[in-house]
Amino acid sequence: MILRKKLSYLWTLGLCLVASKSPPKAPSITNDRFIEECLRLHNEARTNVSPPAADMKYMSWDEALAKTAEAWAKKCKFIHNSCSSKSFKCHPTFQYAGENLWLGPLTISAAKFAINMWYDERKFYDFNTRSCSQVCGHYTQVVWAYSYKVGCAVAVCPNLGSPDSALLVCNYAPAGNYPNMSPYTNGTPCSMCQGDTCENNLCRNKERDKSQRYPNWNPSGTRQLIACNPLYLISVLLTIF
């Protein structure tokens, strides 16, 4: 029994040592620099749409969407989350959420590369006819006027390619990309703001842009059982010896 227990501790220690040699960590969903970059790139894309938008809302960060993105990214599956088609499964207050995915190396700025790549799809999209010659869905979601909340997350996924492969997931609410609809209304910037202020061609509203906390939102349904930190490793070694 004692031997079995020691072997169990050694197995745990081995897992932690392996984890300690993993690729560089992906940015956290609470990392201010990561959040700022995601918001800046999304809003720059929305500001610069052509033709100009009369009703383009400023996009602000949403904690619950980021948690959902993080939970899905950590599964390391390069497919869309099924929650996006299920009522209130991606977010506690928004009925549906949109989603964009990107897969690439973690060695570059995942958010910058991904969002710029999504925005570049505009060259395949004809606004007047709502037609697309190649892939445009990422672009239309990024500039969907009434999607005003976003939450993104990055996870390292060696199983999807190389040891530094990273999966970036961005969730949007309210969801965009509805069939037979334009992503926004063409017109003088902010002319359809309806009481909002206008900033960089985007409709802003302090109440709508406010960041909310969702402490009870746990889309993954799981908790981390082992914390592989130095103090934990020391306690394991002391227990064994």
UniProtKB/Swiss-Prot annotation:
Tissue localization of expression: Highly expressed in testis, where it localizes to round and elongating spermatids and differentiated spermatozoa in the seminiferous tubules and epididymis (at protein level).
Residues spanning the signal sequence: 1-22
One GO location term (cellular component): plasma membrane
Keywords carried by this UniProt record: Cell membrane, Cytoplasmic vesicle, Fertilization, Glycoprotein, GPI-anchor, Lipoprotein, Membrane, Signal
Membrane association type: Lipid-anchor; GPI-anchor
The SCP domain, residue ranges: 39-172
Family that this chain belongs to: Belongs to the CRISP family.
Subcellular compartments: Cytoplasmic vesicle, Secretory vesicle, Acrosome; Cell membrane; Membrane raft
Pfam families hit by this protein: CAP (PF00188)
Subunit record text: Part of a oolemmal binding multimeric complex (IZUMO1 complex) composed at least of IZUMO1 and GLIPR1L1; the complex assemblage is influenced by the maturation status of the male germ cell. Interacts with IZUMO1.
Organism: Bos taurus
Lipidation (GPI-anchor amidated serine): 220
Identification of the protein by name: GLIPR1-like protein 1
Any GO BP: sexual reproduction
PTM field: N-glycosylated. N-glycosylation decreases during the transit in the caput.
